Curated annotation (Swiss-Prot):
One of its GO terms (biological process) is alanyl-tRNA aminoacylation. Its cofactor is Zn(2+). It comes from the Bacteria. PROSITE patterns: AA_TRNA_LIGASE_II_ALA. This is Alanine--tRNA ligase. Its EC number is 6.1.1.7. Keywords: Aminoacyl-tRNA synthetase, ATP-binding, Cytoplasm, Ligase, Metal-binding, Nucleotide-binding, Protein biosynthesis, RNA-binding, tRNA-binding, Zinc. It is found in: Cytoplasm. InterPro entries: aa-tRNA-synth_II/BPL/LPL (IPR045864), Ala-tRNA-lgiase_IIc (IPR002318), Ala-tRNA-ligase_IIc_anticod-bd (IPR018162), Ala-tRNA-synth_IIc_core (IPR018165), Ala-tRNA-synth_IIc_N (IPR018164), Ala-tRNA_ligase (IPR050058), Ala_tRNA_ligase_euk/bac (IPR023033), DHHA1_dom (IPR003156).
Length: 874
């Protein structure tokens, strides 16, 4: 059976047993901040097992995509060198949430594995383990299923503590837990290894293929196990492992799924498919990289993005080792889509995006890979001992982009280890330097501790009546604020929007009789809205009634920019792809700023497309609609949620243009898209690896921006004595004239240099049979000096030349050595000395070198180094 057929058979079997087929969840866990990546089938059902979520079904079956690289579960360094380690794998699983338990779970597993209708595995090849004290499971296996006692193994606490066992599963120190039973396949006596629980169990003969976890206890902090009222079942069977069994091969890399990827990798690299470890690395890594990118991860220097970058660069290095020339990794994506795109449609829909991301990352790493490998080879050649120093590992990481595990891979091939502690010391020193170079403002919310909650009334109002429930000055609770004092006012209700979701807090004022408190900003801590500002007049006490007034003009302008941000987000996903995710935003009354995930600069034509799409939606003048609903209903409607954001039971869904933009948002918005008027993008750039930023203006600010641009065009036209209509032609003519003048200037400089060369050649001194010339030619640039040195080398014959100049307040140096002398004297060595003398750096080839510095006063002394340099070298 092919891997795809096995997957479908598993899902279909359990559907026939009353299970609901559930699609694989994203590799980015949406409900578990403790996980870097989804690494088991049960991850998406965690809240069901904990009793915190009720679903419409109590039986489920899935084929879950999983990644184990980085974090606690990290298989990266073993991938390619063993038969079964992968960064990406599929976990087939069936689950019961308080429905069936041990008897049915065991029977289902045995039937699927051994029935001639399904996998038809020989029963005598299967071994079973149970937890040592789980007599119930043991009896079901032996008395009901019929597994003979000689193929049953009880596994006790083999990890040094109570319930610390390969056959006892825990979610943590406390919480749901229970025994498990595992099914092993015997690959035959020709492979070394013993049954589970034996001294030889680490061999490859007996391989675990299915694990059934029985969650029947809740462990409390005192270590006591209490029976759960509704026991559950969590099972997992690796698709790759069971495919190897059914296809009669021992290594996962020999199954049909991997053979197509290995062939594609070999073709892309230009090598033969001969099962080399490096080829296996590439074939494995294309799966994890392809799926991670499809799920929205982009290469970066932190978190999930850095794990992806490590995997990509490890694949690139192994391809390089096999002789790959240029970018190759992205070329394997098509084979991945052909193999797995049917089961996982996200691969098909995002194939082009995955290829672009991989190619861009390959090209970026290629700039430093070869140079970094040379540096590492030099360091290893000079190494005394078997440990690569931490500072070397750090240099490769910091300067050449080598993740530590990539350097570790290379070291491992030489039977060397890394000084990981030394590397961590270097990393910490860098972090300390970064912290000391940064300054952080104080979070004034952290100073204010408020137990009250404020009712927000600002969605439909900018003014109202309220009561002061708390006052703070310098973070301390006070009963009164006096005129001129800065402080924080907390009200029982307010129309002031508190800073959230990138939208700035409202400003305005509070009026209490003759007292007036000017609100400069509004923030939120817990359920309390904090009005920050200064008491401009009178005094204000706790309990006082106040009239609230938001600055409606600022609020209105801010709301337009916020709505425009939503339209821009939707347009970005249309133009660039659905991988675009919001990474941050700032919305105020003057402009909007939007940070989003993307791997390359946006092209001018894409900027235009974004503006066209957004402005088309603005011109449609559709209503901006809001709806309060639960999170599941919102997601079913296609509402985009910010990843990592925590949402309550009730969420606010904001829609524009029907389904053009549907997002969860609690901010203040326009009434209709037409209110925005116009959007104009003013800048686009990168702010971090894999994160781009767009800044834009709307409405009156956009009109002002365009008017200013119009004035600049008029001014430019005046400068070239033209008009707006013929400005391009006039500018082209000016640039062409400038080009001709520069060419004439170069010709004149060349003539002058030639004349100077004739004069300078007569100044050359003879040092041990070598013509030595050091001269100062202020005002000449580096290009002119290079031409002159070439000319002098031809005229002087056997010669060493150093020319210097002060040009535009900087020192320029050029050194030349005729080729008959480069075995003894090198221009680069002379340049290093001379450049250092003027406070700079330099280098180059043995026959020609360039450099410079900042200390013009030291130029003569630098030139004087030439004769001693020759005397010492000859």
């Amino acid at each position: 059976m092919k891997s795809a057929e096995i997957r479908e058979a598993f899902l279909r079997f359990f559907e026939e047993q009353g299970h609901t087929r559930v699609a694989s969840s994203s590799l980015i866990p949406g409900n578990d901040p403790t996980l870097l990546f989804t690494n088991a089938g049960m991850n998406q059902f965690k809240d069901c097992f904990l009793g915190q979520e009720k679903r419409a079904y109590t039986r489920a079956v899935s084929s879950q995509k999983c990644v184990r690289a980085g974090g606690k579960h990290n298989d990266l360094e073993n991938v390619g060198y063993t038969a079964r380690h992968h960064t990406f794998f599929e976990m087939l699983g069936n689950f019961s949430f308080g429905d069936y338990f041990k008897r049915d779970a065991i029977t289902f597993a045995w039937t699927f594995l051994t029935s001639d209708k399904w996998l038809n595995l020989p029963k005598e090849k299967l071994w079973v383990t149970v937890y040592a004290t789980d007599d119930e499971a043991y009896d079901i296996w032996t008395k009901e299923v019929g597994v003979p006692a000689e193929r049953m193994v009880r596994i006790g606490d083999n990890k040094g503590a109570p319930y610390a066992s390969d056959n006892f599963w825990t979610m943590g120190d406390t919480g749901p837990c229970g025994p498990c039973t595992e099914i092993f396949y015997d690959h035959g006596a020709d492979i070394w290894g013993g049954p589970p629980g034996s001294p030889e169990e680490d061999g490859d003969r007996y391989i675990e293929i299915w694990n059934n976890v029985f969650m029947q206890f809740n462990r409390t902090a005192d270590g006591v196990l209490h029976p759960l009222p509704a026991p559950s079942v969590d099972t997992g069977m690796g698709l790759e492992r069971i495919s190897a069994v059914l296809q009669h091969v021992h290594s996962n890399y020999e199954i049909d799924l991997f053979q197509s990827l290995l062939d594609a990798a070999a073709k892309a690299i230009g090598c033969t498919n001969d099962a080399q470890a490096s080829l296996k690395v590439v074939a494995d890594h294309i799966r994890s990289c392809g799926f991670l990118i499809a799920d929205g991860v982009l290469p970066s220097n932190e978190g999930r993005g850095y794990v992806l970058r490590r995997i990509i660069r490890r694949a690139c290095r192994h391809g390089n080792k096999l002789g790959a020339k240029g970018s190759f990794f992205y070329q394997i994506v098509a084979a991945l889509v052909a193999e797995m795109g049917e089961a996982f449609p996200e691969l098909k829909s995002q194939q082009a995006h995955i290829e672009r991301v991989l190619k861009a990352e390959e090209e970026q790493f290629a700039k430093t890979l070869e140079q970094g490998l040379k540096i590492l080879e030099q360091d290893l050649a000079e190494l005394k001992g078997s440990v690569v120093p931490g500072d070397v590992v750090f240099k490769l990481y910091d300067t050449y982009g080598f993740p530590m595990d990539l350097t570790g891979d290379i070291a491992r091939e030489r039977n060397l280890t890394l000084d990981e502690e030394g590397f961590e010391r270097e990393m910490e020193a860098q972090r300390v330097r970064a912290r000391s170079a940064s300054s952080f403002g104080m979070d004034y919310n952290s100073l204010v501790k408020v137990d009250v909650a404020t009712e927000f009334t600002g969605y439909h109002a900018t003014s109202g009546s309220a009561k002061v429930v708390a006052l703070y000055k310098e973070g301390q609770s006070v009963d009164m604020l006096s005129e001129g004092e800065e402080g924080v006012v907390v009200l029982d209700q307010t129309p002031f929007y508190a800073e959230s979701g990138g939208q700035i807090g409202d400003c305005g004022y509070l009026q209490a009789g003759n007292a007036r408190f000017d609100v400069r900003d509004t923030t939120k801590t817990g359920g309390a809205f904090l009005h920050h500002g200064v008491l401009a007049k009178g005094s204000l006490t706790v309990g006082a009634p106040v009239e609230t007034q938001v600055d409606a003009q600022v609020r209105h302008a801010t709301s337009l920019n916020h709505s425009a941000t939503h339209l821009l987000h939707a347009a970005l996903r249309q133009v660039l792809g659905e991988h675009v995710q919001q990474k941050g935003s700032l919305v105020d009354s003057q402009r909007l700023r939007f940070d989003f995930s993307h791997f390359e600069a946006i092209k001018p034509e894409q900027i235009k497309a974004l503006e066209d799409i957004v402005n088309a939606e603005i011109r449609k003048n559709t209503p901006v609609e809001t709806e309060e609903t639960d999170i599941d209903t919102a997601k079913k409607k296609g509402a985009m949620a910010l990843f990592g954001e925590k949402y309550g039971d009730s969420v606010r869904v904001l829609s524009m243009g029907g389904d053009f933009s549907v997002e969860l948002c609690g901010g203040i918005h326009a009434n209709r898209t037409g209110d925005i008027g116009l959007l104009k993008i003013t800048s686009e750039g990168g702010v971090a690896s894999g994160v781009r930023r767009i800044e834009a203006v709307t409405g009156a600010a956009a009109l002002a921006y365009l008017n200013a641009a119009e004035e600049q065009l008029k001014e430019a036209a005046t400068l070239v004595k033209g008009s707006r209509d013929n400005l391009i032609d006039k500018l082209s003519a000016v640039l062409e004239r400038n080009r001709l003048l520069e060419k004439q200037l170069e010709q004149l400089q060349a003539k002058a240099a030639s004349a100077a060369g004739d004069d300078l050649s007569a100044q050359a001194a003879d040092v041990k049979g070598v013509k030595v010339l050091a001269a100062r030619l202020d005002g000449q640039d580096g290009k002119a000096l290079l031409a002159l040195v070439d000319q002098l080398k031809n005229k002087l014959g056997r010669a060493v030349i150093l020319l210097g100049s002060v040009h535009e307040e900087k020192v320029v140096l050029v050194a030349g050595v005729t080729k008959d002398l480069t075995g003894q004297l090198k221009a680069g060595d002379l340049m290093k000395q001379a450049a250092a003398a003027v406070g700079g750096k330099g280098g180059g080839r043995p026959d020609m070198a360039q450099g410079g510095g900042v200390d013009a006063a030291a130029l003569d002394a630098a030139l004087a180094l030439t004769v001693p340099f020759v005397e010492q070298g000859i």
